[in-house]
From Swiss-Prot:
Residue span, MHD domain: 191-450
GO biological process annotation, one example: Golgi to vacuole transport
Protein name: AP-3 complex subunit mu
Localization terms from the record: Golgi apparatus; Cytoplasmic vesicle membrane
Alphabetical list of Pfam families matching this protein: Adap_comp_sub
This protein's UniProt keywords: Cytoplasmic vesicle, Golgi apparatus, Membrane, Protein transport, Transport
Membrane-related topology note: Peripheral membrane protein
Organism: Eremothecium gossypii (strain ATCC 10895 / CBS 109.51 / FGSC 9923 / NRRL Y-1056)
Amino acid sequence: MYTSIYITDSKKNLVFEYLLTSQAPTFQQLCSKIAGRDAAMDAMVAISKDMSLYRQAVGPEKLWYWALCQACGDPLEPQMFLAQYHQVLIEYFDKEALTVKKLVNNADRLALLLHAMLDAGEVAVTDSNRLRQLVPLRNDLSTILNSATKTLANTVKYADSKQLFGAPVATGKVEAGQTVPWRTADCRYVNNEIYVDLVETVNATLRQKGSSLTLINGSLSGKIDVKCYLSGNPTVQLKLRTSGHPLDNSALHRCVELGEAGVATMNFVPPDGRFTLAEYAIDLSAISQAARRLTNLGLVTVSLASGLGQHRDEFEIKVIIGNSTQVAAIEDLRITVYFPDISDAAKIKILRTTHGGWESDLSRVRGVWAFDKQTAVGSVPVLRGCVENPESTPHAPPVFPSHLAVSYSHVGQLPSGIRVDTIALSDLPPGSKPFKGVKYTSRAGDYIVRA
């Protein structure tokens, strides 16, 4: 049973709270129970004998969702609900990411959504389409109120008393039932459009062995997001070119009906608005060919060499960015370099860099090689440097980086090579000329290169 829901930033600053009972504690009252815990804290904190506080960090927005539950048998259930609530907010506001300002300015919407989703502390409604009907957006609600006010004003202005008080009561037209529960009945759009966004995140750990890289473990996390603004009750058939990757264990939206080709052919009646059609994961370690494993890491390959130079005390980081006619540039490329063995008196000295610049960290155990907003494909950026020991210890052993953390993104192709083959639409209103758009986005998640 849910007692209260809270939203904070990663520093535990309260953004929103929803108390289901008058006895439910505020987040400020709970802070003493979670004081001193860092970002790596447990996902569950016992508050009392039969009450626990669950935490879920969702998305790149660095928002923390909290649920105070009483007598919860399954510890995964609150975390799944919090992740689902975050997804409901994403789809409700039709945003790719949520900000603190957005949540603060729409606190009433957040409370109304939770009021609709929870009944007596138990989950009741989670369908985004149904929630949009129960809790209209501000612009939709304003349109309804303005229309009702205008109609009432015209009726009072032009009708006489006999019409007002002697006419029979008009009965409203009963709308036909929904074709499917996840889609609003009788949708109408001026511009019929459907956008399919495929996003893949690279998570990999590699080790430098001589001049070659060896994959220790790696995976690709992908999802297919759809924004659908189609009139009527259309049927969509989405065909994928999977590039030989089995996607049998994908998590699919309940609207999907699989064809004989499995996830490669998906038929569905789409919800209106934004929704996640499918999520999948590709285990790179399961690929038998080593060369193909590295190919599926994407366009960016980073290597680390140590013991270079006349005194064998230099290190070099090389970034090889592959050529692609589908990708214009690599965006927000950053490489964080870690020196755990550096002394307080030592200094990191950059000898040569072909791209970007070096940013020193106050902790002195790491630095960041930061590139421009965009880096051209086909380029090979190189950074060479060394760690200078103080004059008091001139014969100290050289210090080299222990590992690198890589982050970047680009648009145009996926590391796995998966692409949309066709998007076929049927059962649209006569004369409709829908627009179809496809976008591919690649990102680096936990991408580590060890020395």
